[in-house]
């Protein structure tokens, strides 16, 4: 993000506060932040549709709590660890706690929305069996200890991965890999939902969500919001950022559409029908797949990236369920962890020469543009370190909660549904 523009709202000096350019860029960032925040509604509808009716209230409350707690914790500490300007180092930012001596509020807004998105994605993988207070504590851990450090390494101009030359325009690693691996750790330690696997054969059994209508609505909200989420990472619409921000929107459109069509086609080949739920996930996988590269590639490359992203999603989803017995009700691990990895790697192949970073720091293009493998190595290092950091810390957290019996709800609560047991009754009332 900072790597894209040296004139971002975070680095603007006071002399430009009253310029037209400053107002236009700030307005752009605020509008984009609003769209990124609106992704919470998209994930809420998507996840509500993917869980069973008896857990609808639970999943919606989870998203509201995640967003609210993330706002407070990111305001107090999280943003400081990511972008604090008082004696920062290559490992972590420092200073500006509680936004003291910090006036780049538009930049804070979009960064908070990104952090909240990473937390919401992760907790979806643990739906229908995680205790509510564990959601709350995990949100604090994710927003204070996990997400800000990776964001600092990759997006801050002081970060050490930034100095190595990593390229992650809109968060393939910072958001999606972090969210995917933390959700996977939680889901793995929770274990599968009751009835997810046949007790005799061990084969997975279908536990379908209760509303494809909510899923479809959520998917369309996410697709719409993705334009603010990705194009907003340009941090402005003036000078040299106008064309890249526009190209980002085209790239995201093509990669998402290709991911959807690819997964629908695979489903027709293997299952004999077009699977709406898988198609929705393919759409999101396609969107995720272009997140790191969308500012640096040609539109034709977006189709290839979305196509491969759809394939990666389909087979990783199957392998996680059938080989690892990982019960992820919303498939967020396959979509975001594997999609985020592919997103980060794809930059090293398809990035065009001269677009990577800002005009003052030109890096070689991707392998297909004669750039060699130097960028690929940097991308792989960033991918591995994001997985290790987020996986290690979240693993310790969930293991500790499990050790003290505070991770999973009891059997009776799970069978009755979290809505009836913990939230005052069903989300649906029929006279």
Swiss-Prot record:
One BP annotation, GO: secretion
Top-rank taxon, per record: Eukaryota
Topological domains annotated Cytoplasmic: 49-63, 126-134, 182-211, 271-300, 355-357, 401-431
Transmembrane domains' residue ranges: 28-48, 64-84, 103-125, 135-155, 161-181, 212-232, 250-270, 301-321, 334-354, 358-378, 380-400
Topological domain spans for side Extracellular: 1-27, 85-102, 156-160, 233-249, 322-333, 379
Localisation: Cell membrane; Endosome membrane; Cytoplasmic vesicle, Phagosome membrane
GO CC field: endosome membrane; perinuclear region of cytoplasm; phagocytic vesicle membrane; plasma membrane
One function term, GO molecular function aspect: ammonium channel activity
Membrane topology field: Multi-pass membrane protein
Alphabetical UniProt keywords: Ammonia transport, Cell membrane, Cytoplasmic vesicle, Endosome, Membrane, Transmembrane, Transmembrane helix, Transport
Keyword DNA repair recorded: no
Pfam families xrefs: Ammonium_transp
InterPro entries in UniProt: Ammonium/urea_transptr, Ammonium_transpt, NH4_transpt_AmtB-like_dom
Transmembrane found in the keyword field: yes
Its job: Ammonium transporter that mediates the import of ammonium in prespore cells. Controls ammonium homeostasis during growth and development. Ammonium has been shown to function as a morphogen at multiple steps during the development. May function as an ammonia sensor that relays information concerning ammonia concentrations to the signaling pathway involved in the slug versus culmination choice and regulates prestalk gene expression.
NCBIfam families in UniProt: amt
Family per record: Belongs to the ammonia transporter channel (TC 1.A.11.2) family.
Name of the protein described by the UniProt record: Ammonium transporter 3
Organism of derivation: Dictyostelium discoideum
């Amino acid at each position: 993000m900072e790597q894209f523009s040296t004139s971002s709202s975070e680095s603007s000096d006071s002399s430009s506060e009253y310029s037209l350019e400053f107002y236009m860029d700030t307005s752009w960032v605020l509008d984009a932040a609003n769209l990124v925040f609106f992704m919470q509604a998209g994930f809420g509808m998507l996840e509500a549709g993917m869980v069973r009716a008896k857990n609808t209230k639970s999943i919606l409350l989870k998203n509201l709590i995640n967003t609210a707690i993330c706002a407070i914790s990111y305001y107090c500490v999280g943003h400081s660890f990511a972008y604090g300007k008082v004696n920062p180092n290559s490992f972590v930012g420092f200073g500006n706690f509680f936004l003291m001596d910090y006036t780049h509020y538009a930049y804070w807004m979009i960064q908070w929305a990104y952090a909240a998105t990473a937390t919401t994605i992760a907790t979806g993988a643990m739906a229908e069996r995680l205790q509510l207070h564990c959601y709350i504590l995990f949100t604090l851990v994710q927003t204070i200890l996990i997400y800000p450090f990776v964001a600092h390494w990759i997006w801050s101009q002081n970060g050490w991965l930034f100095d190595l030359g990593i390229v992650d325009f809109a968060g393939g690693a910072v958001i999606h890999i972090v969210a995917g691996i933390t959700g996977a750790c939680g889901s793995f330690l929770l274990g599968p939902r009751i009835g997810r696997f046949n007790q005799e054969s061990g084969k997975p059994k279908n536990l379908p969500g209760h509303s494809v209508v909510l899923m479809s609505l959520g998917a369309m909200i996410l697709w719409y919001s993705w334009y603010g989420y990705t194009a907003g990472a340009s941090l402005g619409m003036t000078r040299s950022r106008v064309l890249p921000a526009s190209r980002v929107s085209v790239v995201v459109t093509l990669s998402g559409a290709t991911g959807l069509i690819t997964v629908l086609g695979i489903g027709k080949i293997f299952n004999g029908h077009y699977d709406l739920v898988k198609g929705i996930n393919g759409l999101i996988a396609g969107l995720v797949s272009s997140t790191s590269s969308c500012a640096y590639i040609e539109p034709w490359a977006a189709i290839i990236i979305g196509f491969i992203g759809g394939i990666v999603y389909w087979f990783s989803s199957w392998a996680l369920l059938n080989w690892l017995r990982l019960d992820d009700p919303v498939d967020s691990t396959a979509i975001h962890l594997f999609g985020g990895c592919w997103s980060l790697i794809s930059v090293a192949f398809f990035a065009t020469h001269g677009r990577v970073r800002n005009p003052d720091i030109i890096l070689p293009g991707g392998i297909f543009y004669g750039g060699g493998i130097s960028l690929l190595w940097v991308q792989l290092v960033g991918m591995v370190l994001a997985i290790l950091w987020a996986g290690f810390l979240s693993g310790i957290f969930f293991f500790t909660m499990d050790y003290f019996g505070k991770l999973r709800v009891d059997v009776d609560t799970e069978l009755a549904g979290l809505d009836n047991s913990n939230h005052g009754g069903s989300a649906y009332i029929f006279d």
